Amino acid sequence: LSLHVAFPISLPPILLDMSLTMSITFSLLILLVALYTNEILDFSVFPSLLLISTLFRLALNVASTRLILSEGHNGHAAAGQVINSFASIVVGNNYAIGLVVFVILVVINFVVITKGSGRIAEVAARFTLDALPGKQMSIDADLNAGLINEEQARARRKKIEAEADFYGSMDGASKFVRGDAIAGILIMFINVVGGLAVGVLQKGLDLSTAAEYYTQLTIGD
């Protein structure tokens, strides 16, 4: 739904800045809650929140791409101050070094973080499902031995089922995040190539100026 809303609507820079700030704040809150959670079931909504935040960020990517391609010829701040600030931090005073650093960060994000976390989620889900029959048998054995009552047995069964559902949801969410990372890389190339084409052919910019504007905006995005 957020993507469908983002396609026809062209966000002004100030609104895009506010939306990006909300997205960053929301992501930091999720990270802090996850770090300070002792039991996974205490934060069982994490896969759903991860999916929602990824969809929201993808919608913002679409909106920022539209703004970059349509207003990028106006300069570095054409897509708002948030994108410009991030680009300035990465690029510094040297666009070549900034571009190399940006490519390294993209590779680390996709190859190391995204693929690694996806593999971890997949293995965790597999081991949890494989261990499910053994845990059920252990609960039945404790119940038959009189170590626990029927109510405690039901609570334990409910807990292990919830854990299995959580890890299964995390496996699915990690695949969605991996797709989002691939989409982000494609959007990056679209911003650069499309920006150069729009800037040079439609807006009358020279190639070096167009490359400077649209490359910095893409890095910030």
Task: Kindly give the residue locations of the regions a language model identified.
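Membrane-interfacial helix-loop-helix connectors in multipass membrane proteins
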Residues: 68-92, 197-221
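Structural signature of hydrophobic alpha-helical transmembrane segments
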Residues: 15-27
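Transmembrane alpha-helical segments and their cytosolic interface motifs
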Residues: 162-192
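Short, hydrophobic transmembrane alpha-helix segments
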Residues: 8-18, 36-42
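Residue-level signature of catalytic and energy-coupling elements of molecular machines
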Residues: 19, 57, 120, 173
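Non-transmembrane, extramembrane segments of multi-pass ion/lipid transporters
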Residues: 72-83, 130-174, 205-210
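Membrane-spanning helices that line or support transport/gating and their immediate boundary helices
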Residues: 15-18, 62, 66, 115-127, ...
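Short, small-residue-biased leader/transition segments that mark boundaries at the very start
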Residues: 2-7
